[in-house]
């Protein structure tokens, strides 16, 4: 996340990089992040899987007009940034990126989307709360059982139906919408760097990419 914040701070100096950090994040990481320009740290309690929804509520901040959501274990790179620029230059309500065959399993990848506040009819916090509360209704036919994919299930159930007709979609595989609904990628994949590629560290601390494009 530290490297991501440095890259984004340099590329989008007028944007705010809002990082949601639970209480178990090491103090030295918090210190380094807090010193990076444009970074705003939001400390949240440890809530397990439910923490994955915290970042979606950035759109509710009074001074946020457009939100882009990214995972901490993926790098922003030229291909991803070009997609962001396409959305910023459009008038679409929601931005969706799918850049791997596994991404076709979900209408919206939880760490690869964006949203304009002007398209919202109610706060994101209210939408999230309503969806989570379904799991507390005994025998509700849409009962929610939280797991590590719950954020993507939420986006499929509660967000995609609202905005799919107003979406700018970059999709390399193209299984979920007709080709005419898709926007082509302007930057080719280089060095395995597709949008959403996961970075890991080996035992010596060297960084490597996890998946083939």
Outline where the language-model segments fall:
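Short acidic donor-binding/metal-coordinating loop in glycosyltransferase active sites
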Residues: 64, 72-74
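Conserved hydrophobic/aromatic beta-strand scaffold that supports enzyme active sites
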Residues: 58, 94-96, 112-114, 154
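Short aromatic/hydrophobic "clamp" motif used to bind/position activated sugar donors
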Residues: 67
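Catalytic core and acceptor-binding pocket of nucleotide-sugar-dependent glycosyltransferases
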Residues: 101-103, 115-213
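A short, glycine-/small-residue-rich helix N-cap motif at loop->alpha-helix starts
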Residues: 47-54
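N-terminal anchoring/stem segment of glycosyltransferases
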Residues: 1-46
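Conserved donor-nucleotide/metal-binding helix-loop-beta segment in metal-dependent transferases, i.e.
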Residues: 76-108
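Membrane-embedded transmembrane-helix bundle of lipid-linked glycan/lipid transferases
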Residues: 2-3, 59, 86
């Amino acid at each position: 996340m530290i490297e991501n914040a440095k890259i984004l701070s340099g590329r989008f100096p007028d944007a705010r990089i809002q990082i949601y950090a639970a209480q178990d994040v090491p103090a030295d990481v918090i210190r380094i992040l807090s010193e990076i320009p444009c970074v705003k740290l939001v400390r949240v309690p440890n809530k397990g899987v439910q923490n994955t929804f915290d970042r979606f509520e950035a759109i509710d901040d009074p001074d946020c007009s457009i939100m882009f959501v990214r995972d901490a274990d993926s790098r922003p790179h030229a291909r991803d940034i070009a997609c962001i620029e396409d959305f910023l230059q459009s008038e679409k309500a929601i931005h969706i990126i799918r850049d791997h065959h596994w991404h076709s399993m979900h209408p919206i990848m939880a760490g690869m989307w964006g949203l304009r506040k002007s398209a919202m009819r109610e706060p994101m916090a209210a939408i999230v709360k309503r969806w989570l509360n379904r799991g507390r209704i005994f025998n509700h036919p849409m009962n929610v059982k939280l797991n590590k994919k719950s954020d993507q299930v939420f986006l499929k159930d509660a967000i995609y139906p609202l905005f799919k007709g107003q979406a700018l979609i970059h999709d390399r595989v193209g299984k979920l919408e007709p080709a005419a609904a898709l926007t082509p990628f302007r930057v080719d994949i280089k060095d395995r760097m597709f949008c959403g590629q996961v970075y890991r560290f080996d035992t010596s601390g060297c960084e490597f990419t996890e998946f083939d494009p």
